[in-house]
Amino acid sequence: TIHPVNPKYADVLGYPCHPSLEAIPGTVDCAAVLLGDKAILPTLKAAHARGVKGVWAFASGFAETGEQGAAMQREIRDFCRETGLLFCGPNCVGYANITDGVGMYSAPLPRAFRKGNIGVIAQSGAVLLALGNSPREAGFSRLISSGNEAALGLADYMDYLVDDPETAVIALFVETIRDPEGVADACRRARDAGKPVIALKVGRSELACRVAATHTGAIAGSDRTLDAFFRRWNVIQVNTLDELLETSILFSGLRGAPTTSRRVGMSTVSGGEMGMLADICSDYGLEFPPLSEEGKAGLRNVLPPYAPLANPLDAWGSGDLKEAYPASLSILAREPAVDLLIVSQDMPSNMADEQIAQFSDVAAAAVRARADSGKPVVVVSNISGGIAPSIRKILDDGGVPVLQGSTEGVGAVAAWLDWNRALAEETEAPLP
């Protein structure tokens, strides 16, 4: 039940409006405060007196504005510590529990929103909105905007997601780490729980540090120190929002036996794209083991005589997407030296119906290769901007992630391999 509170109105959007928190009948679980900066602390006090357990505030005007604002923020912090009131903000867009369809979030969510197992914590509200509205169609469980973190901070939200059964992947947009010990403990708990933490940390340049300070009052730490911090706790680092999404999507949906090697098989339908992807894979240190004689013999039986038998494999030559192409993918995936299969196939959402039908066969072949081999299979669409919904459903149902963008897709695969290797080694790199 929603209870608007404003002494100036009798109703708001059809809901009866109350003159004060005290006037609301029954229990109040949480409160969204849409007031100016100087009204936040008095409202928190009123909420606590009313028995409210959690509060979110949208207002800015605190530590990011200078000493006067910082002093107000410290008062909020001290009050919340003394009372145990859970406070999200200030200067943030709130949070959304996507799984259960509840929350206090200052923006509408897309109509076609994918529920999933990726929990996001962003210290920038605009970034959280961008991720939530992205056409890349990541499946989210929770969206959390932490803002200035006057009371609850990054470590608190991470602890929540580590314990959350609906969240399997934790994605972070970080401007600063205010509580290194708490965040380190949360990262360790995430690692022990088998939940990957993927972080985009800004502030490598002097300009970015200044922007962070004026945005949320954040003090960005040494880039070298933070790199070492993330390496120590096996946090996957990315550089762009697209990379953050694609890497999270891969970890969210990849099925098959984990591998610590970098030996991959790759199938393409284009010689040009094969060369492009080979360069990118080389940049990320991925290896293409040669085909076994048995593998070559199997491919020789399903591909035309002129088709080159190699890894990466150009399997388009047969033109037979119903039998020859699926068979060639399965043969490549079953190669003893191949631990993961990348299928390169562009699948933009605006394709003609005939192409959608054609490339649906490619998606089905990728699913069959995963089932036949028991190994992880990933589809990479080199063009971003959305995947044809019917094709996505085939891949989702078959446990095959589809990634958008060549660099983002290959980078996500490399990150998954690195993460598996670090877990197997169980090493903690020392801080500088």
Where are these regions (language model features)?
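Catalytic-core regions of core metabolic enzymes
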Residues: 1-432
